[in-house]
Structures are given as structure tokens and as C-alpha cells.
Amino acid sequence: MAFDKKLLEVLACPVCKGKLVLNEDMTQLVCRFDRLAFDIKDGIPVLIESKATALSLDEVDATR
């Protein structure tokens, strides 16, 4: 099941409540402010802070 991009309009980072962006290969939602990546499993984003991956500044910059 693919991630529905329309969800980006209503989903927010669970940490800062900011905007999330879809990464290039459409496997993660990224919060650029907190530098966290949330996996998408079977089309469903896993928006749990303890399951998120911390990103470097270079990795965050690559998600434009």
C-alpha cells in the first residue's frame, strides 16, 4: 500500500507539531526542524518519537 500524499496536509510532527515532508524515495516522513525521520510501513506513517531516526544536517538538507 502506497502512502497517500494528501495526508501531508493534515499530519504533523509529534514532537514539535511542525510540517512533515516526504523523503525522496517515499519511505519516510521528515521533520526538518527536529531532524527526525519517521518510517512509513505499509502506507502508514509511524509517528512515534522513540521509533524515529535522528538525521544529520546533510541528510535533512537532502530532503528538499
UniProtKB/Swiss-Prot annotation:
InterPro entries: Trm112-like (IPR005651). SUPFAM superfamilies: Trm112p-like. Pfam families: Trm112p. It comes from the Bacteria. GO terms for cellular component: cytosol. PANTHER family: PROTEIN PREY, MITOCHONDRIAL, ZGC:162634. HAMAP family: UPF0434. Belongs to the UPF0434 family. This is UPF0434 protein MADE_1009415. It comes from Alteromonas mediterranea (strain DSM 17117 / CIP 110805 / LMG 28347 / Deep ecotype).
